Structure formats: C-alpha cells, structure tokens
C-alpha cells in the first residue's frame, strides 16, 4: 500500500469516526484545529488520541502524525499515547498546533530484553538493570562502555582511557580469581566482540541480567552476568532520515609535576653524595641548567574526535527497516596514537505470510588502532637535562656515566620512528524465522554468525639510540581469524486461562561452534626502512601458529506463570554440553526459580498518593562459567623440541610434556540468592528498586598440588576445581520526577554496596601475583578479598643514629631512611613482616544524575564515583625513589636532609641500600573519588524555524566529559584497573564536545 492510499484511508476512517460523535460537540462557534503530534526527537506519532476535555469529541492522528478536530475557542485538548505523558493544550486563538509528547520513563509496561525473549518490566521476577538510548545519547564518548559507567546498579565499569581499548566491566563484584567478565549478547547472538566495536548511535537499549534467575537461561556462561544489547529497529510510518554529528577536543585531566633540569641536578648531587659516589662536576651549579625539557609536555597533545552517523528507517504494518553508517575518527592525547572505526548496521523484519515473520540483523565494523612505540613510564623517568633533539637534528639520549645520566632512552623519538597498528574487521549477524503455529504457539529458528579478523603489524627500524641502540630492524605480523556459528530453535507458548492464569513457556535448543586460527612471524634485518615487506627480511626470528575449536550444545526452557496480575513465578533450566571438558564432566545443568508478589494489586492494599505500586521479589539459581578454561585443558599437552640421542648426541625432533591431563576439570559454579522489591511512590513520581544478593562461587579453578615425582615442578601446569569466593551486597536505584510542567526536573540515583572474600583456595598457602619491579604487589589468600595488596608497613623515618640502633635490625638503614614495622616481632625486618596493606575492590559505587528541561532547553549534570578501595601508586616507586638516574615528582623537593626535616619523604641515596622503595604501604593511597562525569546543555530548535529546511527536528548539544574530580589520591587519575595498581596507565581524557542531531 503506497503512502497516498494510506493517507486517504486514514482520512476516511477519521471522518467516519467524527460523523458518529454527538452533534452537540459541533456548535456554531466551533472551528477546525489542525495539528501534528511528535515525540521529543521530532518523530511523528501515529495513532495518538486527541480529544476535547470533558466531551466525547475525539480523533486520532494519521500515518503522518497529523490530526484535525472541530472545537470551540475556549476548548482544552487532551493528547495521549501509550508510553508517553498525557498533555493538555488550550486552543485559544490558535488554528494549528504542534504538540510534543515526552516519554513516560516510569511506565510499568516498559519492555525488557531477557534471554530468548522479552518481558514487561512489571512482570520481572529477577534483577535486571536497563538503559534506553535517550539515557546515553548526549554522552560525548567513543563507545557505549564509557557511556554506561555508573548508570546501572551492580555494574563496575573502568575506563581504559586509550582510544579503541575496551572498558572493563564487572557485575556484582569479582566472582572468581580467574576471568569474570560478563557475557555479551547483541541482538540475540552471544559474542566475545568488544562492545567498543558497536556504534553507540545504533543502540536502542541495554539490559544487564544480574541475578541467577535472569542469567540461568545462559547456563554455563551466565555466572558473571549478561549484557543484552539491542540495536535500533524501524518503526511504522514514512521513512526517517537522521544525521548525528559530534566534534570534540580532548586533553589529559591531570599530568604529573616533575622536576625541571636544575631541580634534578640538585637531586642527583644529593644521591651521589649520600651514597659515597662522585657528583657530576658539570652540575656543580644546578641553577645553571634552567628548566630543561618537560618530556610529558612533549608526549602529550590535544586530541580530537569526530563521530558521524547517518541512518534511514521506516516501515509499514507489514515490514520495518533500519539502516545506518557511522564513522569515528580519534587522535589520542598521546603522540602517534590514533583510532578510526567504520560501522554499518542493517535491521529489518517482514511479515511475509500471516503465519511467517522473517527478521535479520547485521552489524559490521572495521577499525584501526595506530601508534608508535610510546612509553608512559620512560616519559616520566626521562631526565630533563637532555633536549629532544641536538643541534644537528638527531634524537638525543644519555651517554657517559650511567650514575649521572641514567639509561632511559629518548621517549619521543620512537613515537615517530616505530610503527604499530592493529586492524580489525567484524561481522555479527543473524537471520530468524518465526512461524505462528497457533494463536498461542510460535516456533522461532535463528542462525547467527560472529566472524572476526584482526591483523597486527609492527616495525622497529635499526637506530643508534643512546645508550642502547637497536642493532637490527624487525617486523612482526600476525593474522587472526575467528568464526563462531549459532543455531537456535525454540517454541514460544503464551496463553491466558480462565482470564486469570497467564502462562508463558519457552523451550528449545542452541548449538554453537567456533574455529580460531592464527599465524604470526617476525623477521629481522631489513636493508631499507621504507621497504620492509616480510620477504625483504634477511633473518627469520620466529614463526608460529595454531588452530583451535570449541563447541557448545544446549537445551533450555523457561516458564513464566502469572495469576491475577499479582503472583508471579519464573523457573528456568539450561543443560549445556561443552567440548572443553572430558567425557565425564562435559554436561552441566543450571536451574533457577524466582517468585514475585505484586502486593499493590491486593484488595486490602491501601490506595493513597504515597505508595502506589509495590512488588516483592525473591530468587535462587545456579549458573556456570567456562571463561577461564582452555579449549583442551582436560588433555595432556606437548611442545616440540630437539633432544640429543645416542653416543654422538645427535639432535632429533622430540615431544616434551608441557601439562598434565586433567580429565576432571569442569565448570566454575555460582549459586546466587536475590531478594528485592520495586516500588512506585508519590503518584508514580518516584521509582525505587532495591536488591540484596548473596553470590557464592564454588568449584573455582585454582592451582593443583602436584607431587615432584611427576616431573612437573611448576604448580601452574594444572588446575583443579576447588576454590570458593563469596560476594554479598545490595543495590539501590531511585528515579524521581521533582518538578512537572513547563519546567521539568528529574533525578536518578544509583548505589551499589559489595563485599568480596575468598573462602577457599584449596590450600592455606597464598598466591602472590601482579609484579612491579620484580616484586609481588598483590596476594590471593583465604578469608581475604581478591587481589589485596601485600607488603611492609612503614613507621615514619629514622631521624638519627639512636633511632636506627634502637629499632629492629634493618639492613642498610641510616638516618633519613624509611622505618619498617617489625610485625613478627623477631627483632629483624624481613619477608615475614609483610602483611595485607590494602584492598583494591571498591565497597561503594555510586552516581547521581539531574536533568532540567524548559522550553526546548535541557541541562544534564551527572556525578559518579567509588569509595572503600585503595590504590597502589606504583608510579611513585620510581618517581619518588631518589635512588637511580630517573626524573622524580616534585614531591621529592620536601625530602629528608637532616633531623626533623621530613617524616614522610626519605633521603636521596643512589642504590637504595635500605630498600626504601620496597613494596609497602608508603605507596598505598585512598582510591575514593567523586567525579563530575559530564555536563551537557541541549537545545531543541523550535519547529517554526525548521519548516523552510524541511526538517522535523534539530537538536544542538554542548557537553563536557570528565569535568572535574574530587579525590585524595595523589596520582594522575584515581580510575585505574580492577587490580588497583596504577603503573604508567594511559591517562583519562577530558572531552569538550559539540553535537548536532537532525531528523528529516
């Protein structure tokens, strides 16, 4: 049916409807009002009800969102549409109206995406957090991971900072000492595709399944939570062309204050004098050196980002379509760092027969990360006494006495000479057929593919760097291919019995298979830097490759039962069979059950303006994780090598046993209990969700003890399912409408509390992990949180010889050195005095958003932060160590130089005889912060200004991301990795953005 015919039919229907209305509504003084109804994005709304208040005089909008109605001059029109706030408009002397309806975000009938289906939010019995496109559309960030930070309770998101890198996401704490990343499902296809490959403008909504009753449908992959991403679909109506354009400039939120040349020379003289070495005679007068080179300023720059998306969507009552293309181009705030991404999205569905609906979703992305060989740590450590280049234009570097000049190469040169890039090409798609077998029964079959290709390429030219030259040029290349195929088949039963018993049932199968193939090689010695194809390399350095496969076969079912809209039951079971495990442990069953009671639907429930709706939920279930299990972990593995045989010792090819067979390895399991409630208060103006959970991980993979008689000395060669971890906590989400009317003010508050503890490692012997300068920083031990910091406890500074003498034996100690506590106490400072010195896991995660709207203007302010965690500032080991030829932070200007001069910063002494810089609480700091994450100001251009341009809507946005941070942390930024160690991290950027959204 073409557009003209649809208009005629809608007009005939409208006229017929009007003809049946009471004649009294059309008095002699009536006039005809023409108008159009749109949403906040300028899209017309089809089927909206437009009526005269207090009468039965009403009409509906046609396929173009237009209406006409005859009313008196003093009439008030009431406009309503499902999912939007009702609106009243006085006619007055107007003859035409443009009405914009705002979405009612508090509607209980909001649809939530769950595994293999959707549910109304009011019918949920589990813990699910959701975000719609409007919640993230004004965020001036490069990927959706950055945009969701702090906005969903129970979700910890840590930004990597570097363009193109993925954020780190944890759901309800760290459930394992191994991989505990959530499963990502995009348009129904489980994938390990990084979410930074998705164009944020294509995302319709994001749902996070948190408790077992929600995640058990994904069985052995649901233990760490599930992130459901749904891309945009076409809507019924004429085609809509949309353009989104964003331009941004970025800079570092904070940079370190380092010594200038004269300050460093004075420090070097102190280090030499205090260690009995000869000071550099050229630095006898440090002030003569001036400021020298600020290497941080040389490495950092202003970054730029541009992000464009063009989309076209529409549909009829039989079919819908959405097509978009996007381009993101970003230059990092560090020299030579660049990132570019192209995306294509195509979604369509068609009711090809009354009994058959076809759907397809295709996501394609291509990206490239590019950089030279930058080194944040060496940039901080490089001495300011050297220029970037010498008088002849050559890169400078230290030469001569290493005690004075050190061994840190010029950190800027390699960013220009070296080349490194990663190219990625991703295809994620599915096609499904939904067959209606009966009004209450459907069969859905989906075929999906997840194809990824990525190529690494790096080239390092031969160069006479000082003090250590690169003797041979080298090139490294790797080609990686991954194909994952999915085939889902399941029945959907949905029926209501006796008007009160509603039953929904999903049952079916899922099969997934993956093939991964990689090849890498490195060749050295290229005659010309400009011609470095692999064939031109003279020396083969290394070559390698491998091919692996895995498969997963599953049976799953979910039952939803509802009685009288009051009592709700959800029961789920999934049985998975994985090729990663031996025959006796290949299959696992993962059940869950949850109940909900909508108390507000009971007849006795008080009807008032305070508590309008109350639903109480409880659930329990078991899910699994195989993320940390290799494809062939249950088998013994061998490496190829050579071995001398016979009397002559002739080398022959041989196989060497690498790991023991482990046929008993199986899934890690998580049993989770969840109790919560959802409430609506104050005439639906406040929405409160609360959840309390206990999350117990069992059968966690830990190192197995192996008898030395086996021939294996390294206990990491095999693992056993014997570990236990517990996470407990609660989550609160509160959304309020504070002011309604011409001025609107809404607030959102999200809070998460989580405690983490290792219950068992199958041994009382701790594991020490994460090294800095060849010393372990973190520890795994029974009855402690995951990754606690482990080291010495400081006790001020020795001020004189008497204090040194009266203290426990501390080798190398002299006045001005750090004093360490003797915790044993055995009178000697040694490894036995190390203890837990901090917990990197945040106990509190919180955020608050405020949005004010008035006459087309919208101001949004978003705060986000964490508390209860510590950070190990590993940068300070070298940058306040004052024991080697490294530049230092200006903190060392307050160093100890005599009794009473300092109680926190030790003396400068080359070689560090007291080990002042050993792992200790000296480097542990409070990691709490409150960040003004974003401010955005948007303006919706009035419709009368747009008519001449044939625009439906236009929106201009000015925004800033990472505006300011309140923190006691002295490092560059308190947002560090989940292990809590801050070491040469890529800095977080502050972004200033201007955006334009046009809808035609």
In which residue ranges do the predicted regions lie?
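Conserved small-residue
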Residues: 242-290, 720, 739-840, 880
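Extracellular/periplasmic, surface-exposed regions of secreted and cell-surface proteins
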Residues: 136, 174, 181, 275, ...
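Switch/connector loops and helix/strand junctions flanking conserved nucleotide-binding motifs
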Residues: 121-122, 217-219, 237-238, 252-254, ...
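Short, small/polar-rich motifs associated with maturation and membrane association
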Residues: 1-345, 350-353, 357-361, 365, ...
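Extracytoplasmic gating/loop element in the C-terminal half of outer-membrane beta-barrel translocons
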Residues: 284, 296, 467, 539, ...
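Acidic, glycine-rich flexible loop segments
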Residues: 274-291, 305-309, 376-412, 419
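Glycine-rich, aromatic-lined ligand/substrate-binding cores of catalytic
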Residues: 839-872
């Amino acid at each position: 049916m073409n557009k003209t015919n649809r208009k005629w039919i809608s007009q005939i229907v409208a006229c017929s409807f009007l003809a049946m209305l009471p004649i009294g509504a059309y008095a002699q003084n009536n006039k005809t009002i023409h108008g159009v109804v749109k949403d906040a994005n300028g899209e017309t709304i089809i089927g909206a009800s437009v009526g005269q208040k207090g009468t039965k005089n009403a009409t509906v909008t046609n396929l173009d969102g237009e209406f006409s109605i005859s009313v008196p001059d003093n009439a008030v029109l009431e406009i309503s549409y499902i999912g939007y706030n009702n609106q009243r408009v006085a006619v007055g002397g107007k003859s035409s109206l443009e009405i914009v309806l705002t979405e009612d975000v508090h509607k209980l009938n909001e649809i939530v995406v769950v595994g293999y289906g959707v549910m109304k939010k009011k019918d949920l019995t589990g813990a699910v957090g959701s975000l719609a496109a409007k919640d993230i559309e004004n965020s001036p960030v490069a990927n959706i991971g950055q945009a969701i930070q702090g906005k969903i309770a129970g979700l910890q998101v840590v930004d990597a900072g570097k363009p193109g890198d993925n954020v780190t996401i944890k759901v309800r704490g760290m459930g394992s000492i191994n991989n505990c990343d959530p499963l990502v499902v995009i348009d129904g296809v489980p994938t390990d595709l990084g979410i930074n490959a998705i164009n944020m403008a294509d995302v319709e909504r994001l749902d996070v399944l948190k408790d077992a009753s929600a995640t058990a449908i994904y069985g052995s992959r649901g233990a760490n939570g599930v992130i459901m991403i749904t891309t945009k679909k076409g809507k019924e109506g004429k085609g809509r062309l949309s353009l989104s354009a964003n331009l941004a400039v970025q800079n570092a939120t904070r940079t370190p204050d380092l010594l200038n040349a004269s300050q460093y020379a004075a420090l070097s003289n102190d280090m030499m004098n205090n260690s009995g070495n000869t000071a550099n005679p050229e630095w006898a007068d440090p002030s003569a050196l001036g400021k020298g080179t600020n290497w941080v300023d040389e490495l950092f720059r202003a970054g730029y980002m541009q992000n464009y998306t063009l989309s076209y969507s529409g549909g009829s009552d039989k079919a819908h379509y959405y097509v978009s293309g996007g381009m993101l181009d970003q230059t990092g705030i560090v020299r030579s760092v660049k990132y570019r991404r192209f995306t294509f999205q195509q979604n369509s569905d068609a009711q090809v027969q009354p009994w058959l609906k076809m759907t397809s979703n295709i996501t394609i992305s291509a990206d490239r990360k590019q950089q030279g060989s930058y080194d944040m740590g060496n940039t901080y450590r490089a001495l300011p006494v050297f220029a970037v280049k010498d008088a002849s234009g050559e890169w400078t570097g230290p030469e001569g006495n290493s005690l004075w000049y050190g061994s840190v190469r010029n950190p800027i040169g390699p960013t220009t000479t070296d080349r490194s890039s990663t190219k990625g090409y991703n295809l994620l798609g599915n096609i499904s057929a939904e067959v209606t077998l009966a009004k209450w029964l459907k069969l859905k079959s989906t075929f999906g593919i997840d194809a990824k290709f990525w190529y690494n390429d790096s080239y390092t030219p031969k160069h006479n760097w000082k003090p250590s030259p690169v003797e041979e040029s080298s090139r490294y290349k790797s080609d990686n291919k991954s194909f994952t195929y999915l085939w889902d088949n399941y029945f959907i039963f949905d029926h209501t019995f006796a008007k009160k018993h509603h039953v929904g049932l999903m049952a079916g199968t899922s099969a997934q298979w993956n093939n991964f193939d990689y090849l890498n090689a490195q060749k050295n010695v290229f005659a010309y830097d400009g011609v470095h194809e692999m064939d031109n390399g003279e020396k083969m350095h290394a070559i390698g490759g491998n091919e692996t496969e895995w498969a997963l076969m599953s049976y799953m079912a979910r039952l939803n039962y509802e009685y009288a809209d009051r009592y709700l039951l959800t029961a789920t079971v999934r049985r998975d069979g994985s090729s990663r495990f031996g025959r006796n442990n290949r299959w696992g069953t993962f059940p869950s059950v949850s109940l909900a009671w909508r108390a507000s639907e009971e007849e006795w429930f008080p009807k008032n303006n305070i508590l309008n709706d109350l639903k109480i939920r409880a659930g329990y279930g078991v899910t699994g994780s195989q993320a940390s299990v290799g494809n062939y972990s249950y088998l013994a593995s061998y490496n190829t090598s050579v071995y001398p045989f016979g009397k002559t010792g002739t080398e022959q090819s041989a196989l060497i046993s690498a790991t023991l067979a482990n046929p008993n390895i199986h899934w890690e399991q998580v049993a989770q209990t969840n109790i919560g409630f959802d409430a609506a208060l104050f005439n639906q103006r406040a929405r409160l969700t609360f959840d309390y959970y206990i999350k117990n991980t069992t059968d966690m993979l830990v190192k197995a003890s192996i008898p030395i008689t086996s021939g294996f000395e390294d206990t990491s060669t095999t693992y056993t399912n014997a570990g236990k971890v517990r996470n407990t906590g609660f989550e609160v989400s509160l959304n309020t409408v504070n002011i309604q009317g011409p001025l609107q003010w809404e607030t959102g508050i999200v809070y998460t509390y989580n405690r983490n503890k290792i219950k068992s490692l199958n041994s009382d012997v701790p594991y020490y992990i994460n090294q800095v300068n060849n010393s372990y920083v973190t520890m795994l031990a029974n009855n402690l949180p995951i990754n606690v910091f482990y080291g010495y406890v400081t006790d001020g500074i020795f001020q004189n010889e008497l204090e040194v003498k009266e203290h426990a034996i501390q080798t190398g100690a002299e006045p001005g050195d750090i004093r360490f506590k003797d915790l044993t106490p055995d009178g000697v400072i040694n490894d036995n005095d190390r203890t837990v010195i901090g917990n990197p896991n945040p106990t509190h995660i919180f955020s608050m958003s405020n949005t004010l709207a008035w006459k087309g203007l919208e101001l949004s302010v978003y705060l986000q932060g964490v508390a209860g965690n510590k950070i190990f500032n590993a940068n300070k080991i070298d940058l306040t160590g004052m024991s080697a030829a490294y530049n230092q932070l200006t903190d060392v200007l307050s160093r100890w130089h005599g009794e009473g001069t300092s109680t926190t910063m030790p003396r400068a002494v080359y070689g560090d005889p007291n080990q002042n810089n050993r792992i200790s609480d000296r480097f542990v700091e409070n990691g709490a912060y409150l960040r003004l994450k974003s401010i955005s100001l948007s303006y919706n251009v009035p419709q009368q200004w747009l008519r001449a341009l044939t625009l439906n809507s236009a929106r201009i946005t000015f925004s800033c991301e990472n505006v300011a941070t309140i923190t006691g942390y002295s490092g560059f930024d308190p947002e560090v990795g989940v292990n809590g160690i801050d070491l040469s991290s890529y800095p977080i950027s502050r972004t200033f953005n201007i955006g334009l959204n046009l809808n035609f």
